[in-house]
Design a protein with these regions (language model features):
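Contiguous, well-folded functional domains in the mature portion of proteins
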Residues: 1-130
Length: 130
């Protein structure tokens, strides 16, 4: 299960965080703080939108996170892979720089997971006034 860079930019920080390996399924999120407790790795990217954080979260059957060694990323470039099965990627943008599609927001409010594929539209960048 390979994952890609969410944005293009220079990597300014990397961090590995030890943790447990709880399932990342929706039902578990109601009982545990999985994004806080699970093993994870992140990189902070310096992008045209400002700092963007991309974090890979390990899961119950995914004990290993393999990130490629590189100093910068291009949006859509393979960033790494999980050792077994699938897991979760979190991408945090500066406030006011993106707008998520309404269907994703609606499903999230209802506690329904939205699975996406590479190239599928999930939102849009907003115009930034300097």
């Amino acid at each position: 299960h390979h994952y890609l860079a969410a944005e293009s930019g220079r990597i300014t920080r990397r961090r590995k965080i030890k943790g447990r390996l709880h399932t990342v399924r929706q039902v578990a999120q109601k009982r545990r703080l999985i994004y806080k407790e699970n093993k994870r790795e992140y990189c902070l990217l310096d992008t045209d939108l400002g700092p963007v954080l991309q974090m890979e979260v390990g899961a119950l059957l995914v004990g290993r996170i393999y990130n490629h060694s590189q100093d910068s990323l291009v949006r859509g470039q393979e960033k790494g892979c999980f050792g077994l099965g699938g897991s979760t990627i979190l991408v945090l943008y500066p406030a006011g720089t993106i707008r998520s599609d309404q269907d994703i927001l609606t499903y999230s409010d209802l506690g329904i997971e939205t699975q996406i594929q590479m190239g599928e539209k999930i939102g849009e960048k907003l115009c930034l006034n300097d």
